[in-house]
Amino acid sequence: MQFDYIIIGAGSAGNVLATRLTEDPNTTVLLLEAGGPDYRFDFRTQMPAALAYPLQGKRYNWAYETEPEPYMNNRRMECGRGKGLGGSSLINGMCYIRGNAMDLDNWAKEPGLEHWSYLDCLPYYRKAETRDIGPNDYHGGDGPVSVTTPKPGNNPLFEAMVEAGVQAGYPRTDDLNGYQQEGFGPMDRTVTPQGRRASTARGYLDQARGRPNLTIRTHALTDHIIFAGKRAVGVEWLEGESTIPSKATANKEVLLCAGAIASPQILQRSGVGNPELLRQFDIPVVHDLPGVGENLQDHLEMYLQYECKEPVSLYPALQWWNQPKIGAEWLFGGTGIGASNQFEAGGFIRSRAEFAWPNIQYHFLPVAINYNGSNAVKEHGFQCHVGSMRSPSRGHVRLKSRDPHAHPAILFNYMSHEQDWQEFRDAIRITREIMNQPALDKYRGREISPGIECQSDAELDEFVRNHAETAFHPCGTCKMGYDEMAVVDGEGRVHGLEGLRVVDASIMPQIITGNLNATTIMIGEKMADAIRGRQPLPRSTATYYVAGDAPVRR
């Protein structure tokens, strides 16, 4: 089998590339996905409110685990990643958050990455998006990804939580993806107007599936990339239960889009990485590239949970006898509780003046429950997810076996810097201040977690060690740049090799201030133009907020 391009991974970026590259009818593309189809009749991935279900099984989730995390009481921590058409956009929380303009401007300070500034990237965010309330300087109106804006009046707790943030002295913002990210306000989500999850399989692949120049293979687990000297010329994979490898050649390029965990793992299995690691598994070294799998970053978060005195939380929706009605409303009308991911409000703040842009993120949820659906509090409650945004801690992804079915060794080194501890202590104390504002007086009961007895630095630290969890935002393991630990250049091309690019969240040099999906899609759009040899979209002229000397609180 011969194709112009072979794309490994049908996730948030891979589906963008598959769709854009096949817009040229003379370009042939093979898209390999280790998971299965995105079954449209499966409520677990299609109903926004059911977002916890895919994380509980292995049909749609790789369900990785970390090595024992040394600063987290040696816990082995969850590291869920999407498996199936759509990748992690098929199982994520659907929060559409782009990050802060300063994140991208910071990337662009690196020599060779000047074209990754916010104003260079904004046109690609807009190109990807159709926002339900219409386009403006920041938002698109005719892109493949449906973005829905929360409507006032869905749940009084959302408005009360935003108002509490404002009463505590923080800004209000009408659009966390617009002129000013800093502050509290409504949180956009990747949901269609019909109340369905807007994964990249739905948004992008649906328009490309019927094209004769696109071949999609599901249940196709990539074993390794085939090289002729220093040039990537094809891919070998295992299909279904078969132990006999399938093979295809790429006339132009192999495009690796397997995500921050699997992309470095595939490179290492293919002989690209740290030679010392490769020799442990008798893998012939194709290219010595020590940064492969290093620079692993994530967002860590925790929940502050409160009893709700008024019966307005989503607690009744967790009772089985209420779920058939919720399901029917969603299935037949695309409305009701089922049509929302329930992360309808949130915010970004600076915990201290030394941060030039927000370093703490909030998601508000009108029920007290773990993200993966476990440990639901059996009463009316609400909670605040809070975590730091740009931790200095760095980890790695390293091969443990040549077997493509084997998971790699994943270590985030969460909380390995003093800055991490300071930010989490600040975050808990600030959150308590916000929760004690008058806007929440009629709703706020006792603090369920951490519990009011948890006050000293040592007590807060122990709570974080035992209870903080991943926000499922791994990135950085094939970082873009030109230093000795960089893996790809500013166009995604792997240093020292030909015919091979990485295009996914692994190329982010530094993690962004917010959820990763929107920016991963943007990276796919921007790289698609580079691969096609097109002129980049014209730079935006939109203005954006820079805090400067503005106080953290008013």
UniProtKB/Swiss-Prot annotation:
Domain of life: Bacteria
GO BP term, pick one: glycine betaine biosynthetic process from choline
Entry's EC annotation: 1.1.99.1, 1.2.1.8
Gene Ontology MF terms in the entry: betaine-aldehyde dehydrogenase (NAD+) activity; choline dehydrogenase activity; flavin adenine dinucleotide binding
Native species: Klebsiella pneumoniae subsp. pneumoniae (strain ATCC 700721 / MGH 78578)
Gene field: betA
SS bonds (residue pairs): none
Keywords: FAD, Flavoprotein, NAD, Oxidoreductase
KW Ribonucleoprotein (keyword) present: no
UniProt name for this protein: Oxygen-dependent choline dehydrogenase
Cross-referenced PROSITE patterns: GMC_OXRED_1, GMC_OXRED_2
Pathway assigned in UniProt: Amine and polyamine biosynthesis; betaine biosynthesis via choline pathway; betaine aldehyde from choline (cytochrome c reductase route): step 1/1
